[in-house]
Structure formats: structure tokens, C-alpha cells
């Protein structure tokens, strides 16, 4: 029977996406996130028992490697990469790395135990697809099976993107989701009343996973998923464009976004660490956008821009 090697990295919450990327790049077959914030404030609504945890800024990122992997080399590389991330200004915290062997059947499902239903915004709750959940009145439930290589929607960058969509969408809009990943932002847009959603990702795996997640949610036939390199070659106009990806990539799409967004439409950009904030602001302002909202959670920033001639209450341009 084949065995797998489980590596757990304890880092600051702000480093979640960057460290997850490091683990995937070193050969992990997927990652899971254990975050105390997912449990804080949870109520035993229908007999569920949630762990008794204290709020902490540290999270555990669990990665799974084939038994043939030279774990000593992998751990050395992980530590080198984390030190480099810290030198760039990303808050990684006091890093510790643990490892253990895991049987095949345990590996297949072990990562799922770290995911619980999570209320993300006033209206939106993300629920793992394998969990039974009874929604309260008015609650909009996003069923998600992210797979081990995609986030579960609880990262600050995703939360802020979802909050922005909830504030902006009123029904009937056309939305473009750039770098859709698990598809969570597209599904949320549909649940919040958008008429048509176009979801693009350069990664073929993401395109497949996004479509699978969309199929888990009823009433999402208005979401169209396709492979795409940012907004290159896109001609469809939109009321809202949302992108939750790395800041260095965000700056490459602002001109195309301005071309595609209708007047009085919105551009939501998330995934921006603080040291990259000015770079993203400059790119959006140069494209012609005005800043309407700036959200911050820890080291992460999300920005809501508007394409408008009415500059009262907005900044930049």
C-alpha cells in the first residue's frame, strides 16, 4: 500500500497564499488550511460540535507529498523560500515545519477535515460540498469542493472580494471574473443576482475545477467558464470585473478592464500585499479609474474602482 508524507507549515495568516504556492511548487499534491478564524463565532445551530479554539494569527498549511519525495530536501527548500518571502516584506511569522507518514486511504480524505461551513459576509456562506447544511432565511449558500490545490474562500483576499460583490451587485449585471480559480466569485455573483458571468483562468485545472463547483450550485447556468489569459481577446462589456490574483498580474489587466467596463461600472482588485499597493493604484489611475473603496485585512488589500465622469466621493483618475 502506497504511503504519503504530510508536511505541516505553521505561518502567519497573511502568508497563506504565498506559502501554499511554495508547497505546490516543491511537489505537493495539494494543500489544506487549518485556521482558527474559521471556527471563531460559529454556533452549534443544529447539533454541530465546533472545536474550542482561541483566535490566533498563525495558521497551519498542510501539504501532501508522494512517499518517493526526499523530504529533507523539500523542507530545506521550504525554509529557504519562506526566508525569501520574509525578506520581501511579507509577514510569515515564527515558522515551524512538521512531517509524518500517511496511508493512501487517509491521504485521499484527510485534507477535507480542515474545512467547515463559514459565513463570509452578511448573506454569503461557503459550505464544503460533502457537508450537510441547513441555511437560515436569506442566507445564500455557495457549495464548494475546491480540491486540494485551491482555497476554500476563507482567505482575506477572497472575503474582501465577496464583500465588494455583495455591496455592488443589485441584479441584472454582467460580471467578468479574472483568474477564477475555484469559481467562488463567479458563483457568488450568480447568487447575488448577476445576469451573466464570464469566468476565465489560464490554468486548465482551474477551468475544470471551477466548472465542477458551478455544477454543484443550482441556478448557475448563467456562468460561462473558459481558458483565458487575463482579458486578452475579450470583447464582452461588463458592469463589474473582479480579479483576486497577485498584484504583479493585476497591473497587467487595468487597461483592458477600462476598455471593457461600462460607464459607472466597477473594477474589484484583490490579492494585494501592502508593499504592492501603490503599484496597483498607479496602474488603475493611469488607466482612468477612480478609487471608491479601499479595504484592508492584515497585510492584504482590496480596491474597488469606478469608471465614471462623476468624481464626487472618489479618488484618483
Swiss-Prot record:
Its main location: cytoplasm. S-adenosyl-L-methionine binds at residues 158, 179, 201, 244. The keyword Cell division does not apply. The keyword Metal-binding does not apply. One of its GO terms (molecular function) is protein-lysine N-methyltransferase activity. It catalyses: L-lysyl-[protein] + 3 S-adenosyl-L-methionine = N(6),N(6),N(6)-trimethyl-L-lysyl-[protein] + 3 S-adenosyl-L-homocysteine + 3 H(+). Gene3D superfamilies: Vaccinia Virus protein VP39. Keywords: Cytoplasm, Methyltransferase, S-adenosyl-L-methionine, Transferase. GO terms for biological process: methylation. It is an enzyme of class 2 (transferase). CDD domains: AdoMet_MTases. Belongs to the methyltransferase superfamily. PrmA family. Methylates ribosomal protein L11. This is Ribosomal protein L11 methyltransferase.
Amino acid at each position: 500500500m502506497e504511503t504519503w508524507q504530510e508536511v505541516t507549515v505553521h505561518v502567519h495568516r497573511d502568508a497563506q497564499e504565498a506559502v501554499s504556492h511554495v508547497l505546490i511548487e516543491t511537489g505537493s499534491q495539494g494543500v489544506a488550511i487549518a485556521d482558527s478564524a474559521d471556527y471563531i463565532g460559529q454556533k452549534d445551530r443544529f447539533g454541530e460540535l465546533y472545536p474550542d479554539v482561541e483566535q490566533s494569527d498563525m495558521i497551519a498549511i498542510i501539504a501532501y507529498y508522494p512517499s518517493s519525495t526526499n523530504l529533507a530536501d523539500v523542507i530545506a527548500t521550504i525554509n529557504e523560500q519562506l526566508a525569501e518571502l520574509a525578506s520581501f516584506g511579507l509577514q510569515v511569522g515564527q515558522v515551524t515545519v512538521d512531517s509524518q507518514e500517511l496511508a493512501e486511504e487517509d491521504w485521499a480524505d484527510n485534507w477535507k477535515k480542515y474545512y467547515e461551513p463559514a459565513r463570509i459576509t452578511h448573506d454569503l456562506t461557503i459550505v464544503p460540498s460533502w457537508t450537510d447544511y441547513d441555511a437560515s432565511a436569506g442566507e445564500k449558500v455557495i457549495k464548494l469542493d475546491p480540491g486540494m490545490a485551491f482555497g476554500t474562500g476563507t482567505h482575506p483576499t477572497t472575503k474582501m472580494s465577496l464583500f465588494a460583490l455583495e455591496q455592488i451587485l443589485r441584479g441584472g449585471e454582467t460580471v467578468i471574473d479574472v483568474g477564477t480559480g475555484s469559481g467562488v466569485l463567479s458563483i457568488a455573483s450568480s447568487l447575488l443576482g448577476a445576469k451573466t458571468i464570464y469566468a476565465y483562468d489560464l490554468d486548465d485545472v482551474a477551468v475544470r475545477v471551477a466548472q465542477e463547483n458551478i455544477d454543484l450550485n443550482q441556478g448557475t447556468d448563467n456562468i460561462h467558464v473558459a481558458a483565458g489569459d487575463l482579458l486578452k481577446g475579450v470583447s464582452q462589456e461588463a458592469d463589474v470585473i473582479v480579479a483576486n490574483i497577485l498584484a504583479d498580474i493585476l497591473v497587467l489587466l487595468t487597461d483592458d478592464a477600462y476598455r471593457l467596463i461600462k460607464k459607472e461600472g466597477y473594477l474589484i482588485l484583490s490579492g494585494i500585499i501592502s508593499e504592492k499597493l501603490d503599484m496597483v493604484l498607479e496602474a488603475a489611475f493611469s488607466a482612468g479609474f477612480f478609487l471608491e473603496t479601499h479595504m484592508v485585512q492584515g497585510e492584504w488589500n482590496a480596491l474597488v474602482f469606478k469608471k465614471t465622469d462623476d468624481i464626487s466621493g472618489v479618488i484618483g483618475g
